[in-house]
From Swiss-Prot:
This is ATP synthase subunit a. Gene3D superfamilies: ATP synthase, F0 complex, subunit A. The keyword Cell membrane applies. The gene is atpB. One of its GO terms (molecular function) is proton-transporting ATP synthase activity, rotational mechanism. The lineage of its organism: Bacteria, Pseudomonadati, Campylobacterota, Epsilonproteobacteria, Campylobacterales. It holds the Pfam family ATP-synt_A. Keywords: ATP synthesis, Cell inner membrane, Cell membrane, CF(0), Hydrogen ion transport, Ion transport, Membrane, Transmembrane, Transmembrane helix, Transport. SUPFAM superfamilies: F1F0 ATP synthase subunit A (SSF81336). F-type ATPases have 2 components, CF(1) - the catalytic core - and CF(0) - the membrane proton channel. CF(1) has five subunits: alpha(3), beta(3), gamma(1), delta(1), epsilon(1). CF(0) has three main subunits: a(1), b(2) and c(9-12). The alpha and beta chains form an alternating ring which encloses part of the gamma chain. CF(1) is attached to CF(0) by a central stalk formed by the gamma and epsilon chains, while a peripheral stalk is formed by the delta and b chains. Belongs to the ATPase A chain family. The keyword Oxidoreductase does not apply. It is found in: Cell inner membrane.
């Protein structure tokens, strides 16, 4: 099976170049949508403003269900930005001639690492170093020696699962689309495109949800 055709690949076959150009394209589209939504704010929203307000409200409600309204509002800018960026990055891969930057492990891992570092920082900042790391010991003192390494490994596995879940699903979608186009290039595969579009939104939703869940668990004050 050959390489996935991309328009940017006509300029250079370098993997880093293709990855960076698609990532910058996703960032540019996200910034353009935000600018369009804020360029002519109205009391009764219409057009792009209406879509963006509905999106922000949905993200806030999701966060409220996970960690309460106050905390959800605090982290709304971060989670909403991640969701918008990841969603657009995923959707780019649905368009023939483009490849989702989330289909590159470098992108998915960097994004997951950023979330991992930030929620640990927030947990330490809000609870203190000792109290934050104490929850890795478990509730039974005589099992501390056993639970601590297990909890540490489990904690770092979040980084792996968060990055590989996004990368694996999006990369698989790209391969699926390539196979469909190879088997039936003369027929517009509407059903696969609809499915891939749904999956693009779903993966962005899952990434946002997990970000809220990890933030919520990091800042929660628990007594052991």
């Amino acid at each position: 099976m050959g390489e996935l055709f991309t328009f940017f690949g006509l300029i250079s076959h370098d993997k880093t170049f293709i990855y960076m150009t698609h990532m910058l394209l996703a960032a540019g589209i996200a910034l353009m949508l935000v600018k369009m939504a804020m360029s002519n704010l109205k009391v009764v929203p219409t057009g792009t403003q209406n879509v963006m307000e509905a999106y922000i409200s949905g993200v806030l409600k999701m966060g409220t269900d996970v960690m309460g309204q106050e905390a959800a509002r605090r982290y709304l800018p971060l989670v909403a930005t991640i969701g918008l960026f990841v969603g657009i990055a995923n959707l780019i891969g649905v368009v023939p001639g483009f490849e989702a930057p989330t289909a590159f492990l470098e992108f998915a891992f960097t994004l997951a690492l950023s979330v991992f570092i930030y929620y640990n920082y927030e947990g330490i900042r809000r609870q203190g170093v000792v109290k934050y790391f104490k929850h890795f010991l478990g509730p039974v003192w005589w099992l501390y020696w056993l639970m601590f390494p297990i909890e540490i490994v489990s904690h770092f596995s979040r980084l792996v699962s968060l990055s590989f879940r996004l990368f694996g699903n999006v990369k698989g979608d790209d391969m699926f689309l390539m196979v469909i186009l190879m088997l039936a290039p003369w027929v517009l595969p509407m059903i696969p495109y609809a499915l891939l579009t749904f999956m693009a939104f779903l993966q962005a939703f899952i990434f946002m949800m997990l970000t809220y869940v990890y933030l919520g668990s990091a800042i929660a004050v628990e007594e052991h």
